[in-house]
Amino acid sequence: MSDQNNTPAASQDENHIISERREKLAAWRAGGRAFPNDFSRENIAGKLDEIYGEKESQELDATPVEVKVAGRIMLKRVMGKASFMTIQDLSGQIQLYVTRDAVGEDVYADFKHWDIGDIVGAVGTLFKTRTGELSVKCTDIRLLTKSLRPLPDKFHGLTDVEQKYRQRHLDLIMNEQTRFTFVARSRMVQSIRNYMVSHGFLEVETPMMHPIPGGAAAKPFTTHHNALDMELFLRIAPELYLKRLVVGGFEKVFEVNRNFRNEGLSPRHNPEFTMMEFYEAYANYKSLMNFTEGLLRQAAREALGTEVFVYQGRELDLSKPFARLTIVEAIHQFHPGFSIAQLNDEAWLRAKLTDLKAKLRDDAGLGTLQLMLFEETTEAELWEPTFIIDYPAEVSPLARRNDANPEITERFELFIVGREIANGFSELNDPEDQAARFLEQVKAKEAGDEEAMFYDADYIRALEYGLPPTGGCGIGIDRLVMLLTDSPSIRDVILFPQMRTE
């Protein structure tokens, strides 16, 4: 038995392998049949295994099942007049049994020169090997695509993290977990869309290039429109456009799309990321929290089949009601040594934050100081799903003030495994209050805050036509996928994450 092509790239020099494969391609071209596109696949590996994997060998022999499969060669064993190969498609792998007598001498002679990574199409009948493996006994097999570059060694796989991100196509070929992650992502996003539509929401698309960046506190990317000779900004959030639609009478809208923020890279941050934002007239932040819980449970069921799963070695249960705590309540719960009186004392908060080496602004008020202490000491502790509610007005320029206490807003952020997953609030629909808060943001920007918002006069004009009482929420799709696929880094769940140029 020969080990010819038994593993993807062995110890040979890669350039030599590529040269040999180019020679094979040249010979294939000379035959006038290179890269055909007339093979029609009728079966996929995973479905065949699902239907026939448990059937007995005698049953398959008694009632032959003809199949047409196609995929990439991942393993090949040539044994004289009979050979085995394993091919892979998105659904899984299946073994092919190829003999000279069944496919003919010419085809078998060509077959022996095919390489790991080549893509083939095969016709045959299902059978079970002596070890019980479901296989295809080929009556015809064709080379469909020649692979010129060798795949990584199957025993070591693609282990270089940078290479995985830069060559995602190779990562998808070699790593089943990567394929699972992105299939799960697709299913999750589709389930979110279905959930929104089933609750009466209309999916819309809003501009990706804005004359004024708005809807979030973030530094934007800039670009220039040549024909209009104007500076534009890649959107940091779709919020202000979506709320314009609510003004226009679209009472329940949502959008799944990209945002761009010219900020740092981290396991939780990528400058280009996906958000789902939704807005509902005659709703408030309390009803939105209930809705968001239901949406996340549905996403988990669709992606994983369960609401209880393990993330990074710890169990997480989305089936239980999510906790709801104010900023001060959360700090005190996880750090009972900090008294409620201390947490409401500006001088104590400043001293504590100084000890923690936090960057303090002179104009930071009580609410900002409490939020900073929460972020420094408590945010990472919120493993179980927890809504942090009633954010200070000074850090929530688009949120409605609380009627009982105008220093806070009707706003929440949802944290799971110590990460912000969602941010929502009762929308500020008072145009005069919104204008005043925009002016405060302008002052902050002039004082050096690059993430402070611009004054958006056109949005104020839209509010002056009347925005009904409205609730809105944004959910980070990438972070949610991280959660549901047990992925430690946001780069693991973005097909082509931003990378530094090689």
Curated annotation (Swiss-Prot):
<dbReference type="InterPro" id="IPR004365">
    <property type="entry name" value="NA-bd_OB_tRNA"/>
</dbReference>
<dbReference type="InterPro" id="IPR012340">
    <property type="entry name" value="NA-bd_OB-fold"/>
</dbReference>
<dbReference type="GO" id="GO:0000287">
    <property type="term" value="F:magnesium ion binding"/>
</dbReference>
<dbReference type="InterPro" id="IPR044136">
    <property type="entry name" value="Lys-tRNA-ligase_II_N"/>
</dbReference>
<comment type="subunit">
    <text>Homodimer.</text>
</comment>
<keyword id="KW-0963">Cytoplasm</keyword>
<feature type="binding site">
    <location>
        <position position="420"/>
    </location>
    <ligand>
        <name>Mg(2+) 1</name>
    </ligand>
</feature>
<dbReference type="GO" id="GO:0000049">
    <property type="term" value="F:tRNA binding"/>
</dbReference>
<keyword id="KW-0648">Protein biosynthesis</keyword>
<keyword id="KW-0067">ATP-binding</keyword>
<feature type="binding site">
    <location>
        <position position="413"/>
    </location>
    <ligand>
        <name>Mg(2+) 1</name>
    </ligand>
</feature>
<keyword id="KW-0436">Ligase</keyword>
<dbReference type="InterPro" id="IPR018149">
    <property type="entry name" value="Lys-tRNA-synth_II_C"/>
</dbReference>
<keyword id="KW-0479">Metal-binding</keyword>
<dbReference type="Pfam" id="PF00152">
    <property type="entry name" value="tRNA-synt_2"/>
</dbReference>
<dbReference type="InterPro" id="IPR002313">
    <property type="entry name" value="Lys-tRNA-ligase_II"/>
</dbReference>
<keyword id="KW-0460">Magnesium</keyword>
<protein>
    <recommendedName>
        <fullName>Lysine--tRNA ligase</fullName>
        <ecNumber>6.1.1.6</ecNumber>
    </recommendedName>
</protein>
<dbReference type="InterPro" id="IPR006195">
    <property type="entry name" value="aa-tRNA-synth_II"/>
</dbReference>
<keyword id="KW-0030">Aminoacyl-tRNA synthetase</keyword>
<keyword id="KW-0547">Nucleotide-binding</keyword>
<dbReference type="InterPro" id="IPR004364">
    <property type="entry name" value="Aa-tRNA-synt_II"/>
</dbReference>
<comment type="similarity">
    <text>Belongs to the class-II aminoacyl-tRNA synthetase family.</text>
</comment>
<dbReference type="GO" id="GO:0006430">
    <property type="term" value="P:lysyl-tRNA aminoacylation"/>
</dbReference>
<dbReference type="GO" id="GO:0005829">
    <property type="term" value="C:cytosol"/>
</dbReference>
<dbReference type="GO" id="GO:0005524">
    <property type="term" value="F:ATP binding"/>
</dbReference>
<dbReference type="Pfam" id="PF01336">
    <property type="entry name" value="tRNA_anti-codon"/>
</dbReference>
<dbReference type="GO" id="GO:0004824">
    <property type="term" value="F:lysine-tRNA ligase activity"/>
</dbReference>
<feature type="binding site">
    <location>
        <position position="420"/>
    </location>
    <ligand>
        <name>Mg(2+) 2</name>
    </ligand>
</feature>
<dbReference type="InterPro" id="IPR045864">
    <property type="entry name" value="aa-tRNA-synth_II/BPL/LPL"/>
</dbReference>
